């Protein structure tokens, strides 16, 4: 194991890396590139804060920089199979960061921010419906948003 001060280090220091890149539980990761920076988020089930935001310059060395959701709704206080933030999608469009995710019992939620290191908006239910997971937001050339 490549460890430094008890911390897992995937970067071998010679231009190569060792798997796993992240020695942690970040299920269903989604990554975007904004300029020279990469940002990642992952599913959150009963753990808070929720929707972790990680940053990297090389997709090997990642740092946890924020959480998009500081408190999940009360229904997440007790573990329930299928309950939680499923496969979030992080996107950057027109100067804003967005995260969309599906809760299979309720529908698709969204949160956004102008500053990925700052506060994120309250969660907004954008599409009600059961079984909606694995969202993929896109914007067309006219700026209209779609969820695929």
Predicted regions and their residues:
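Carbohydrate-active catalytic/glycan-binding domains of CAZyme proteins
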Residues: 1-148
């Amino acid at each position: 194991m490549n460890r430094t001060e008890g911390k897992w280090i995937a970067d071998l220091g010679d231009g190569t890396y060792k798997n796993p890149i992240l020695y942690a539980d970040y299920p269903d990761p989604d990554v975007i590139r904004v300029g020279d920076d990469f940002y990642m988020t992952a599913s959150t089930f009963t753990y808070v804060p929720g929707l972790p935001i990680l940053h990297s310059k090389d997709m090997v060395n990642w740092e946890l920089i924020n959480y998009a959701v500081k408190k999940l709704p009360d229904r997440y206080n007790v573990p329930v199979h299928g309950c939680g933030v499923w496969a979030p999608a992080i996107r950057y469009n027109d100067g804003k960061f967005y995260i969309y995710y599906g809760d299979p019992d309720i529908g698709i939620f969204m949160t956004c921010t102008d500053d990925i290191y700052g506060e994120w908006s309250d969660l907004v239910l954008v599409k009600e419906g059961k079984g909606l997971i694995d969202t993929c937001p896109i914007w067309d050339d006219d700026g209209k948003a779609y969820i695929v």
